[in-house]
């Protein structure tokens, strides 16, 4: 599976800065999945579980409010809260 650069930044600092194969987050309109090559998009985040696939392993986190941005193949999450649960 192809990968992309993912950066997750909260008001407390950087939670992740590296490659990922997939990220799924709750936007305000429902869950949104991002893979490599996704079109550019900026959307507000809702509150819910986030799933990130890193090196083939699925990691989960609580993600709450903020923004998701996909620009030029790079994905940036700017949530108010992001806590890894697995």
Outline where the language-model segments fall.
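Compact, glycine-rich, soluble single-domain proteins
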Residues: 5-86
């Amino acid at each position: 599976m192809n990968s992309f650069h993912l950066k997750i930044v909260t008001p407390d600092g950087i939670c992740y800065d590296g490659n990922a194969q997939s990220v799924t987050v709750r936007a305000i309109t429902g869950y949104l999945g991002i893979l490599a090559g996704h079109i550019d998009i900026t959307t507000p985040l809702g509150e819910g579980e986030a799933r990130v696939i890193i090196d083939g392993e699925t990691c989960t986190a609580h993600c709450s409010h903020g923004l998701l941005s996909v620009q030029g193949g790079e994905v940036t999450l700017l949530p108010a809260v992001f806590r890894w649960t697995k």
